[in-house]
Amino acid sequence: MILVDTSVWIDHFHHSDPVLVSLLHEDEIGSHPLVAEELAMGSLRARDDVLRHLAHLRQFPVLSHDELLTLVAAHALWGRGLSPVDAHLLGSV
């Protein structure tokens, strides 16, 4: 199962990625609520369709606040330029 980051989806929406399309057809792509939320905040063509399709993909788990802070401490993730969303995605895979 592959978690696709927001930037990869945005690139795909601008120029279809045949590898991503193939992986989607093979049911190898999953999503995360924070990726859907980031995309929902942007300017998407066919916004409702995109969000609906993302919701139908298998979902990666969401970390609690304490789980995220434990992950950051355990792997010394501070000061590396990661956003909280990046850390959540790392912790969900």
Give the residues covered by each predicted segment:
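Active-site neighborhoods of divalent-metal-dependent phosphate/nucleic-acid chemistry enzymes
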Residues: 12, 18, 59-93
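Short, well-structured N-terminal submotif of metal-dependent ribonuclease cores
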Residues: 1-36, 40-52, 58
